[in-house]
Amino acid sequence: MAPYNFDDRYIKWNTLTLPPVGEVKHLLFSVLNVDEESHIVHVLFKFAANEKIILHRHMIHNNTFVVQGEHRLYEPDGTLKEARPTGMYKSTPPGDVHREGGGADQDVVVFFDMRGNDGVFYEILDDDQNVIASLSYTDVLGAYKAQ
């Protein structure tokens, strides 16, 4: 079966820059909505094909739906942990340390429904799993308002 291509012409893709990390490579995002009362955030992430983004830990509950491509999750050592095809939905609690990326054939687009609070959504880690940066609700809200 031919890969499905999501028409993203109307999506405003953004890069993510986090001090002291700089621009997060192989990642684009678009914040679709932020419910400021309940702290529910809807984001599209695009991960580059055959690449891995920086090591991180989700600090809040995430529901994901793969819109295009294959969503790959990797162990901290780079070993493939899971491959989620187009159309797969997954609900994951906080705490898992991993990298993410796109499959072999195309960039992956994943819808994230993030159920959080007004604190940290993601911890960015070095290869020894030390926290080197974070992405908070306030950061995501700021990105949403700046789009």
Enumerate the language-model features and the residues they cover:
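Ligand-binding loop in jelly-roll beta-barrel domains
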Residues: P85, P94-F121
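A short, N-terminal "cap"/entry segment at the start of jelly-roll beta-barrel domains
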Residues: M1-H39, D126-Q147
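Histidine-/acidic-rich catalytic cores in large beta-rich domains
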Residues: R9-N14, H42, F65, S91
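Conserved short histidine dyad/triad with adjacent acidic residue
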Residues: V31-N33, S38-R57, P93-G95
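Conserved catalytic motifs of the protein kinase core domain
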Residues: I40, N62, D107
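Short acidic-glycine-tyrosine-enriched beta hairpin
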Residues: E36, Y74-G102
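Glycine- and acidic-residue-biased ligand/ion/polar-headgroup-sensing regions
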Residues: A49, H58-D77
